[in-house]
Amino acid sequence: MTRPILIKNAEVFAPEKLGRRDIFIAGGRIVAMEESLEGLSVPGLETIDACGAIVTPGLIDQHIHVTGGGGEGGWKSRCPELVFSELVKAGVTSFLGVSGTDSMSRSIENLLAKVRGLKQEGASGWMWTSNYSYPVTTITDSVKTELFAIPEVLGVKIALGDHRCSFPSMEEVRSIVADVRVAGMLTGKTGFVHVHLGDYTSSFDIFDGIVASGLPIKHIRPTHVARHPAVFERAMGFAKQGGWIDITTGGGNYMGCAADAYDMAVENGVPVNRITMSSDGHGSMPRFNEAGEMVGLGVGSIMCNIETVQELARRHDLTTALLPMTRTVAEALTLEGKGVIEVGADADLLILNAEHEITDVFMGGVQCMRAGEVIVKGAFEE
């Protein structure tokens, strides 16, 4: 049972600016929010005075290699696993775990176990089954069964247009989308195909063919959309047709940073409610030469999410900055109670200072960071 908490005098961005509010959280949810909850009497109530501070929804990151990505540079290039305190420090209260290039030593069973472990430690977590390989890699040997039987699975990941993918045909990808759609109908999950994009625009030819055949565009979710000029041009067109596109905050955007990609998309007519962002955290950040040979490798951080929020807030306003990693992604993935501050929503909250730096984090009503210090850590963290 979580301890009831009253956050007073906060400037609330829900993500829309609401002004000064008191927020009462109990049982992991937001129970009340008013201009003043003075006089509230609840046994065991803890009161936090947030005067001068900002309260926002926790961030949602739909693309973290929680078991570690990488491997493209040989045995020593396998990226390390994520630990719980990294989520806390980055203000990521909800995440989707994902696998990548390595379909040999990174099993989907291990991914599921890691997601469930992070959930036990306090975060909200889901996952994409499979990886870059085709045929898809699943626990149950069926995409439909995967969504039907495993609550954490919201869809399947594939890779297209990348020299590391299996180059499935349009018909093969369409079959995956069809299976995901049916499974989504049966489970109420919607069902998505989360698509790692490489540098080749052929991916969007496949998407166009699938949509033309009658399958709804909402099931196709491309990520890393700003990695190449031609790919981004096609991605913007895809979004203007009603699709969602996901910009990577952790780098790999040809025009600069994720905020640059966001601005370019909006300037080119992409609706803001069709743009999400994710970190690609703990994935490898390989650098290849023109011959396709890897010449360098790094590990993606999830701190790039809050850094992107800060940059977008400098350019625009805090509501604009928060949307791609709060309300928009929650609505895109049909995550009820996530990405918003309203009565009945999950108590996943951040307290920010005037510079939009994270000082306090709440996951499901549990305070995990206080005054910049992580106070709830993972099972094996000191």
Each model region followed by its residue ranges:
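C-terminal cap of metal-dependent C-N hydrolases
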Residues: A10, I30, E331, I341-E382
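Active-site core of metal-dependent hydrolases
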Residues: R164, E172, D179-F288, M294-V299
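Divalent metal-dependent hydrolysis catalytic cores, especially in the metallo-beta-lactamase
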Residues: L82-P135, I150-S166, M185-D199, K218-T223
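Metal-associated gating/positioning segment near the N- to mid-region
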Residues: L45, A50-A113
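Divalent metal-coordination and catalytic microenvironments
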Residues: A10, G28, G52, H63, ...
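His/Asp/Glu-enriched, well-ordered alpha-helical/loop segment
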Residues: E267-I351
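Short amphipathic alpha-helices and their capping/turn segments at secondary-structure boundaries
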Residues: P43-C51, S142-L147, A258-P271
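Histidine-rich, glycine-flanked metal-binding segment
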Residues: M1-I5, E11-T56
